[in-house]
């Protein structure tokens, strides 16, 4: 450090400053790369002020005392220690760059210069936020709140006038960034004796250290603190009392001031001395320190002629050491921040359950538990306030910026929940997922996150009801989970239908206008000038037209640019609706007079079948989502080339509609553990998995020893196969364990039991013990275990136990599952008792996750489309071969010719059987799998063959669930969801 430190206080009186800064000026001051290098004469200070030269005289108000070298040795020691600690932190964390922010309201830059110099010596970065002197309290607080939520800033100090130091301003600071120790929380911890957990006022600490370094024994000394207020007064009193001193605080206008000054061994001035108080009231030999706010801010000098007391400590010593101790606090703040970024067990307040028997309805259970405020949950799991967007009290969106903040954090363990071929009633994968995370976090104290799909309102009002889990293992509030949530599906519907409208509108306009008229409307005159938009320039580049001036295109280029020449018979993009409506499966559009006879047959799909939903589920960033949306192929032109959303010029608008939907939704389980609900593609007509982004964020938040449990739709043959071959390819993530959910009910069905129909009471075979049916049906469980083993991932079977299941049936299933190759098989009782009922499953999953995964894909994406379809049909479904319809073969040829042959396959098939026939239970054999059609989701990144007759728009049953759904108009409570 050498000669630089003595230069800092060459002047205590500053020359007149230039006019105040603008309303807000942020001046970043990057730290120097080295430590010592002496200060050079004429070196420019912050904001263009010249530092004092070595030869400049010190102000006459600085009275002798100890030599500058002796004074600076204390500061040098503090700064050197801070520098060494920071260097060690950066050795282990090279990307760590601690930043101190200083909010300055005024034009006096003395303290600013001191802080800058010392920060440079220690290796810190400083950002100054310069505000005018007349800034209001509200303006100061606004700046504080911005810095509080800036993850790049690790410490915050205020350099403002004393009249702005209100409780409201001081307590606006985040305690963990309050390096001056002025907030009530830091002061409270200091008073309580937890100095190691808080920041101590650098000024108060400087006073103590200077006294002790000067050889003053504080034990038994009478300390008088005069004119101090607020945080400084409290900190001084607390620190002096810790040293055994008798401390008294007094104000300047107190009657007994003269006698108290006369009795004191040490006097600490907390505010400027009034002119009428003579210095002669202080006994010669008394140690005096000036800590007044005006002096520390450089606004006043030493005042009238001085008495040289025997134990005088120079005022500038307090300034300089306080600044050094602020740097020390700053380094401590950075160290604490790094520690917070490392894996730790969450300090999660779990909600207690009081299970009832018989188990009430799902909505009664949900309503009986009061959820935590979602901002509290977010803080518990390590999210920052600026990383969440709160919707009401119980749900929030999480911003993708958390991935950047935690990019160096190791991922947790990744668990997939799949199932055997289900009954139409479902076998409880969501319930198992939630029960498992409740067991891990609430009962085993392991960080865990559930990642679930958002349910479509179609099935919610149709046949299935809610999808928030069930019993004492569900997401709450379940009515918010099952209905609109945060509007993601509505955003998808709007974006999808905007694109559909753009397609038909473009066909109409191209069919009714000349090339020139079309071009002039696509590139209109604005203020006499034609300009291409950004997306139009991209289309020109795609067409090989290297021009940017609309007036320079030839007639041929104008025609090429203006006409997409869409072949209506090749349009694959359909309108969508989030309602089960069978009468929209085939419609005619364009029959109005204004459409001039340009009508065609079309259809509606369920909203979650939209390719935009698949894009949302597979994207990993906003930029990636925009690129995927632009690549979506909606049709072919009349020469057989693909037409994309980019060609239609609608990509930017789609991205705007989806910009909030890309953020995962945070909710909680009944026991207060975190859940991400994000994206909800169907598993039979899409890839059936929640979003990649939700999984990636959750894996960072749980830490290396934590668990993220996500669910794949329907049976392992559908949802799990697509999870591995599509989602894992897109995300680059590798699962550690598969949990395979089975029920005695479903196994009895596969063993030859009567058909199971939604809304119809179960036959006695399902409610009474029947060992033979269970044993025969375990063939389906064994097949699904074998499918899992194709991918090299250990599998744990979770038997979701119903109240009618017997011990003999349960034991038989677990035994046969282990014989089939399962790592373990565990009965689960979470539905009736919550996470406590899945503790054995949680332990089995932890043990399985400790084993090495030998994950592998089922096929190479570079092989031909037909071969990939055949591999899935034979290896997963057990088919003898496949049969392509002429239409399917033509589509495969077209997609291959267009360059899409290297995409993975997403089979659209019934979920009720391993085959294409829903009534074929167990393990069908020797069947030929018919491929009736093949479609492409180029933006999502897969080809999807349609197996047999697959509807992409469900219908309502005779008695839909909406018969039971109602609203209490007095309490506004939803009734009838189950």
Swiss-Prot record:
Pathway given in the UniProt record: One-carbon metabolism; tetrahydrofolate interconversion
Region (Disordered): 1-71
Regions annotated as coiled coil: none
Composition-biased stretches (Low complexity): 1-10
Amino-acid biosynthesis keyword on record: no
Predominant location category: mitochondrion
UniProt miscellaneous comment: May participate in the progression of colorectal cancer by conferring growth advantage. Could be a new molecular target for cancer therapy.
Family: In the N-terminal section; belongs to the tetrahydrofolate dehydrogenase/cyclohydrolase family. In the C-terminal section; belongs to the formate--tetrahydrofolate ligase family.
Name of the molecule in the record: Monofunctional C1-tetrahydrofolate synthase, mitochondrial
UniProt organism field: Homo sapiens (Human)
Organism classification: Eukaryota, Metazoa, Chordata, Craniata, Vertebrata
